[in-house]
Every structure is written in structure tokens, then in C-alpha cells.
């Protein structure tokens, strides 16, 4: 039985992963085993940080919204306002509320008055 060396197939596979790792430093861009390991690590880090970015933005929106609610002097906190918002069945998420608070403070004041007027 003759020996098959897989030259072109293996080279194509390594070239493909080497192209991905061409921006890495040192042996992480030259050695195949290191390239594979660093590629896996890069994908894991990117997935983790995408999830972390979602959490960070949510924290930012909550902080901004809390500051805006306390600044307009409606008289209650962020948590109470969100609770009353859900009870009055207004469908506004934190991102939209924060944009309203930044761009048009009067509109946020009117929304909070509507929540208080609805008697929840």
C-alpha cells in the first residue's frame, strides 16, 4: 500500500488558519499548533466580551436613567419608576428611555407624570 502525504490539503488548511492569525504577535502567527490554540482563545474571548458589552450597556442605561429621574425631581427612584412603568403597561425599554432622557428631558417628565396620573 502506498503512502499518501496529504500535502496540498494540509497546506490549504494551515494557510487558511494562518491567514486568520496573521495579525497575532510572535510565534502565535507562525507555528501551526500555537495558531490553532490562539484562534480558539480569540473566539472564546470575543464571545465572552460580546456578552459583557450587553451587560455594560444595560448598566450604563440604568445609571443614566436613574440620574435623569432624580434630576427632574419627580420624587422617586429608578426602581420605583420602572416598576410603575410596567404596571401602567407602557412598553419602553431602558435604552429608549435613556435616549429620551438625554435628548428631550421634557418628554421624560411627561412620561413620568402619565405614570403617576394613571394611579398605579
Curated annotation (Swiss-Prot):
Subcellular location(s): the record lists: Plastid
Q: Which Pfam families does the entry link to?
A: Ribosomal_L20 (PF00453)
Gene Ontology CC entries for this record: plastid; ribonucleoprotein complex; ribosome
Keywords, ordered alphabetically: Plastid, Ribonucleoprotein, Ribosomal protein, RNA-binding, rRNA-binding
InterPro entries membership: Ribosomal_bL20 (IPR005813), RIBOSOMAL_L20_CS (IPR049946), Ribosomal_protein_bL20_C (IPR035566)
Q: What is its main location?
A: plastid
Molecular function terms in GO for this entry?
rRNA binding; structural constituent of ribosome
**Presence of the UniProt keyword Phosphoprotein in the record:** no
Cross-referenced PROSITE patterns: RIBOSOMAL_L20
Gene3D superfamilies hit by this protein: 6.10.160.10, Ribosomal protein L20
Biological-process GO terms, alphabetical: translation
- Say what the protein does: Binds directly to 23S ribosomal RNA and is necessary for the in vitro assembly process of the 50S ribosomal subunit. It is not involved in the protein synthesizing functions of that subunit.
Q: Give the family, as the similarity comment puts it.
A: Belongs to the bacterial ribosomal protein bL20 family.
Protein name stated in the entry = Large ribosomal subunit protein bL20c
Q: Which gene encodes it?
A: rpl20
